[in-house]
Amino acid sequence: MKELIKNWIPFSHQNKEKDTFKDVPKFLLSGSHRLGAATINSDIDGVILVARKGYWPTQFENDFFGNFECISKKCLNRENILKEEGDLNEVKEDYSLFCKLCENPQVENLRRIYGRVPIIGLKFAGFEFDLSFVTLEEELLNKFFKEENSLTVNQLDEVIEKFREEMPNIYFEANNETIIRLRLNTLLGMIYALSGVRSTLRFVELLDKNINKFRLAYITVKLWAKNHYIYGGKFGFLNGSSIAVLVSKFVLENSNKSLITIIMELFKYLVNYWFKLELDEEKIIVVETPKDYENTRKIVDWNLDKEIKQREEHFKNLLKERFEKHSKTLWPIILPGFPTQNTGFNINGSTDLIIKEEIKGGFDKFRILEEQFKNLLKNRDVDNSEQIWKDWLNGGKFSDKYDNYLAIICLHTELSSYGPQFCEFTETRIRLSLLSIVENKNPRIEYCHVSPTKYLDNKPCPKEFVEKRFLDWICNVWIVGIKGSVVEINETLSKNIFRDFNKLRRGKKLKLSDKKKYRLETKFFVKDELKKIEDVLYRN
């Protein structure tokens, strides 16, 4: 990936001869891979750095996302995508990274992901990548980013401060809806991407000699959360960043303790103390209190009062009279970034109940296995250590957790221009759609629990989920467990997501013919029906 980025000449630099092109784009590794704590299926997070050459929204669009579509490994002008299948006019004026990736034979599942930090998602050479984009003054690039491994927290803080000086303070006061509507996320996303790298570097500095203990504890807790279906920030659950903060806090406070003790203390703290706290300053979980750039941090850093206000406005607009359950739920787990950010922002009243229930169950199970763990510590039962850990990590099958399930089915033809993007967009809307359309309109439903792992991921549609005429389409399926009485859901969920997707295109034309090539459907199952489907689909 680094070589691919290095050999790419962005649109904003196309007026330079290739031989004299010196402002080479850079790939900056972030996330769990930089921490050395990646698991087998961890995404590789990267920040693409490009020398600034113009107005930031224009450069973002031209250099990063581009304006063309990726169809059959060709980057094509939207206006030149004809209705007749197979008649595609190739145009070569888009020099964006999106198009550079589109035409690479090792790239699969390429998509633009609009959000607080806009990213390009893809699979490259078998690995999943999430790429964000930052433009910096050429002087800063040359000064601090010649050697990635030599980058320090202080250097990155200086870069972020200079970047921040060019931004109006009001940008940091905007709520998420305003940020997306005014496209401020293209600029704010850049500073948050740099802040994410800063957090990773700071974790390494703080943990120092305890970094290996942290890595083991982090991977263990992450696997536990995944196996218990509460790992996935976009669905309102824990994510890699929140687990990193929680684990690093307990490694730093128990640096001389064993891995088992550290994890036990973390779960004990959450269940016996933190879950019972009122929402005030005492509940905020941090691993450092930064002292530098105090005046700037007063403007840009996360703030409890501001988030409470934003959550109240957000959920009041979304849910009307039943908003308090979610607006008053807050998990303030703060990354050591610049600006600081709350990793638990997406957690709501429903996912809060689910996470707490699973963590309490994990703590109870830990206590049952405590004697076996004590023997591990004394090296008396080493031969059984693998099985003891498996017993604790095992979260069972999702299809056993609830009596009723809802399948959210996004399907498209193989030739659909926008189908893959629509399904990607659908995934980002599931969390809030379940609150506003399913739970809010059905008081007998206590909560909905979406399994963060797709049931089907870009697979041929099976007859168990679609009508016969769609069996040659591609399916993405999410399964939602329902706690409470089930009432049939009408087409509102599908219609709302379609409407929001069309708004997101911001006036860019959607061919009528392509609108018929992707769909969103829902289907109910009881537990036994879902288990029978599993037996058919996964019998091999």
Show where each model-derived region lies.
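Non-catalytic helical "accessory" subdomain of NTase-fold nucleotidyltransferases
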Residues: 1-540
